[in-house]
């Protein structure tokens, strides 16, 4: 079930970020930004359960944030439009190739592929023989303007890529 969720979130990331503003300088989270303190569930940027949108945005406003309102589909919203007081889940996703976060638009352009084909491209056996591919995201659950849960999840496509070939 978790692998299927990660697969869906990966595809959602690809499709949702296609509506992001073009030509803007993008910031990328590093692999260490996805680490959580095991005891406090605090992110490396100091965000923890119980924090509000002000603390969250101070740490993550410059990054791509996908939002799911009341359990709906994840979509990109400008930070000023994210309804933090609703029942909300936000994710900060990244694909890493050979240890570096990738800009999806640039990656697709450089490799001559359509965004809709990115997941197939990244999970292709011949590509995985030459590269390491990791999908990571931080997931924040919100209720009444406060963070109620934080999780860091990932999918190592080199280890688990065969799952995607079958689905």
Language model regions located:
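Bacterial N-terminal signal peptides that target proteins for export
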Residues: 1-9
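C-terminal motif of bacterial Sec signal peptides marking the signal peptidase cleavage site
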Residues: 18-21
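Bacterial signal peptide processing site
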Residues: 23-25
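A cross-family detector of function-defining hotspots
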Residues: 27-28, 32-37, 42, 48-167
